[in-house]
Design a protein with these regions (language model features):
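N-terminal export/membrane-targeting signals
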Residues: 1-20
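Intrinsically disordered, low-complexity terminal tails/loops enriched in metal-binding residues
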Residues: 18-165
Length: 165
């Protein structure tokens, strides 16, 4: 009986260690714009590399758009994004993107996911909805969302019910 308990405890300890050993993504650990952990969001993380050799690691396309706005004037060399399924970095410009669907997006009101192959993107759309898109369409949609968000900053409309006459 004692051996059984020891075996169970070892099995539980090993299983917990395996779950905790989630493979960390490339540096930086956290998004430079929002602070979200990039390993946790490995399926949406991005790396933008500029022609001057500098780069930024972000949690999502939303924070890439923020980075580009802050770095305006810098020429982009490449964009990489985590494949939704494998979390491996792939070329964001050649990835198949899905906009929308029922899965909640990362840092954006409308979800945007990248896939290494069309079969995976089609399967995602079939299960979760959304539509296939190019990187340029996804980036334009993200920039539009950010512009709309900026436009509404400082306009906290609480109604007029508290006015006293």
């Amino acid at each position: 009986m004692k051996r059984l308990w020891i075996s169970i405890m070892l099995l539980l300890a090993f299983g917990t260690a395996c779950l905790a050993a989630e493979k960390k993504v490339e540096a930086p650990a956290d998004c430079k714009h929002c602070g979200m952990n990039r390993t946790t969001f490995g399926h949406s993380r991005m790396v933008i590399t500029y022609k001057d050799g500098s780069s930024s690691g972000t949690c999502s396309i939303n924070c890439v758009a923020i980075d580009m706005k802050k770095q305006s004037g810098k020429e982009v060399k490449s964009f990489q994004v985590g494949d939704y399924n494998s979390k491996k970095l792939i070329n964001a410009k050649t990835a198949l993107w899905v906009i929308g669907g029922k899965k909640q997006g990362v840092m954006t009101p409308v979800a945007k996911w990248a896939f290494a192959d069309k079969k995976a993107a089609d399967a995602f759309v079939k299960e979760n909805g959304g539509k296939l898109a190019t990187f340029d369409e996804v980036l334009a949609a993200t920039e539009k969302e950010l512009a709309e968000k900026d436009q509404h900053k400082g306009h906290d409309h609480k109604g007029h019910g508290d006015h006293k006459m």
